Amino acid sequence: VKEFVYHGGGFIGVGEPAAHQWQGKFFQLDDILGVEEERGFNLNTDKYNWDEHRDHFILADSEGKVDFGEGKKNIFALPETKILIQNNQEVQMAVKTFGKGRGVYISGLPYSFKNSRILYRAVLWSASAEEELHCWYSTNYNVEVHAYVKNGKFCVVNNTYEPQDTVVYKGDGSSFELHMEANEIKWYQI
């Protein structure tokens, strides 16, 4: 995993990824994720990295509070880590570069439309593929775009019981505004 990420890959860890107390560390991939859990073995470690960076690509279109579910307690950031969200000096979301690759740590991620969007953006960021965001994409996280390129069709789905407005981006990056009724599905030719 470390070699993959170091050479340009991405890794997303949720909760306690690769966690096993060994050689003074609990998170064995702490050099990729940039976080460690305080378990009484690293009390001598300086923990001064608490500044939040909520303007990050991963959080760009998620307003308000992020739901981490139960999340994890006692998580702190290593010095070169960028904390996206922390709560009472417990890291909830952080990012770190490792060699040519990137790692993302999320303390918990229960399913919701908003969290689905956050995970999607985390996948793009960790893969260094931010420029692919506006490809088969909806600006409203309650609305999804599904492309069936081989069949020459795509559909737009309103996942809610309420009308929604969005901007839909097609595979070529072109876009159009769309109003959808509750639970509506609209089909289009590519």
Q: Where are the language model's segments positioned?
A:
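A conserved amphipathic helix/loop scaffold
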Residues: 1-190
